[in-house]
Amino acid sequence: MVRDLRTILDGWDFEPGKISVRKIIGSDQRQKIQARVDLGVMQFEVEGRPDGNRPEGCESLLIFHERRLMEYQREFDGDDEFELGTEDCRRLRHEAYLYHQRYVSLFVLEEYEAVERDTETTLRVIDLCHRYAASQRDRDALSAYRNYALMMNTRARALQEVKCDEFENGLAIVEAGIVSLQKAVAVEDAYDPPCEIDNSSEVDLLVALRGEIIARMPDSALPKLNTELAAALLAEDYELATAIRDRIAVAASEQSNSER
């Protein structure tokens, strides 16, 4: 049996700063995701836990602990004394890392529904540890990454709508995501010490995506016209602003008639 990785990596060079991902068919005849890294490759299952393991006989460690929690709540009519120990949290953090690596790869492959699935899983891990970890350190360990996962979830849901030419739905998702992240960042700035992750960058990425979606909209779309109007007013081009207002009135009237 050939075990040299060069047989896998020939013709697939590592490029610093670039996320290089591909899908292959494994020896079990199922699809796998491979991500090129320096000196090697990471491989993930497409569904279930990324490493293919079934901890405690469950699809994931998260599901195992969620079931534990539900059983505890049924038995004790609440969750006041339910706790996750340090080792539980360490293993959950590792699992969250696996899902993170896969959803980043899936995003490159533009498989947005799968990105939504994995980011939601990551957010569930973060929230579970934050609420039930026995130690403050374990409660806070993943919290700094929540906004990134939320941002990626928002991008995935919005871009899935855009793929279907549902631009206004995609824009609404981004707008809601921006508001949620701005509130989260404001709370962190007010109460938490500075952390190593700049959460404001997540807002910036969504603002940029909002602009990209608006740019791809039809010229008669109200969000696009409103953006053009704001730009004209900022440039003090009042003649252009008047013309755009007329187009907005026509577009709004047509939209109102179509909704009747």
Describe each model-derived feature in a short phrase:
Residues 81-96, 138-150, 211-221:
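TPR-adjacent "capping" and linker segments in tetratricopeptide-repeat scaffold/adaptor proteins
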Residues 92, 99, 118, 147, ...:
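TPR repeat positional signature
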Residues 102-106, 110, 151, 156-161, ...:
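Conserved small-residue packing positions in alpha-helical repeats and bundles
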Residues 1-129, 175:
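N-terminal alpha-helical interaction modules that lie
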Residues 81-86, 131-147, 186-199:
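Acidic, Ser/Thr-rich low-complexity linear motifs
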Residues 115, 122, 129, 176-180, ...:
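Alpha-helical solenoid scaffolds that mediate protein-protein interactions
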